[in-house]
Amino acid sequence: MSIIFSVGIVILLLNEYYYHVVLKNKPEHKILRGLKNKYDMIAFGSSYGLYGISFPKDSNGFNFCLGGQFFYYTDKMLREYAPRCLNSGGTVYLIIADLVFAEVGKGLYNSERYPLILSKKSLGDEYSLLNYLRMRFPFFFNRRALRQIARTMIKGVDNGFDTLTLNQLNYEETLQQAKKRCFSWCQQFHLNDTQTNKIPVELEEKFSRTCQILTSMIQFCYDEGYKPVLVVTPVSSAMNECMSDAFIKKVLYDNIEKANVMAVPFLNYLRDGRFQDISLYANNADYLNARGRLLFTKELIIDSKYISQ
């Protein structure tokens, strides 16, 4: 009996090490740590926010963006986290990715992660105890966990994109990454290309629904006394080369205009010349590296303070 008990303790300790150390840089884990404090400014959104925002230490801000996320879950995170973590009158940056209006997102794109970071009240009938257990006790559900623990003990925690400060790709390689991104969008959203403004009828229907969600998020911020700011993050010159003005207007700007009925501040950096240099990106064409994120966020804070005066 004592042997079984001892083995159980060892396994639980391994899980805690795996959860708190090996996975410490996972966005979900950063979010959980971020929920322990109060801030003057917070950001919500998807991958473009995750790899676009890095608040300087003296700014008292936190980035709650999560990769592969659409407005459905962003809305839930905003409503649960802002009252808990944002100081009265604080700023809410709503990061709007190029194709974020193209999908509502319910039950899609790693939705099993949300029971770890959102309450049962927020998720309603989507809440799954099994998914919570999978996320909270990952050692028991990952056959590679022991190998990852050993690698972490030897080499240290994997920081991924967190510390990358230079794009190791040349322009042609970065352009190829941009083309791959656009091709994946065409596959995912059934687009002909990223040059025309003609899109499928079903996408128009999703635009209508996602615009309503964004309008609701803006209204929530006003009702709670927060300062919402809509933000389109920059992408490199290589990425911009692959997207026409007509396409971006159709899938992004027209939807922002439709959703922003309260005319809240909108800061658009998509083609901003200050952030076109490919050296600011993380071995791709549209995710800023650590240096680029910090430079951009400093400018974002300055600009948002200016427009609020």
Question: Where on the chain are the PLM-derived regions?
Answer:
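Extended hydrophobic/aromatic segments used for targeting, binding, or gating
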Residues: 206-283
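A general structural motif
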Residues: 38, 87-91, 225-227
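Alpha-helical transmembrane signal-anchor/signal-peptide segments
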Residues: 18-38
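Histidine-centered active-site loop/cap adjacent to the catalytic His
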Residues: 282-309
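Secreted/periplasmic serine-hydrolase-like ester/acetyl group-modifying domain
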Residues: 109-224
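Membrane-embedded segments
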Residues: 48-136
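Hydrophobic membrane-insertion alpha-helices, especially the h-region
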Residues: 1-16
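Short, hydrophobic beta-strand segments that form beta-sheet elements in well-ordered domains
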Residues: 40-46
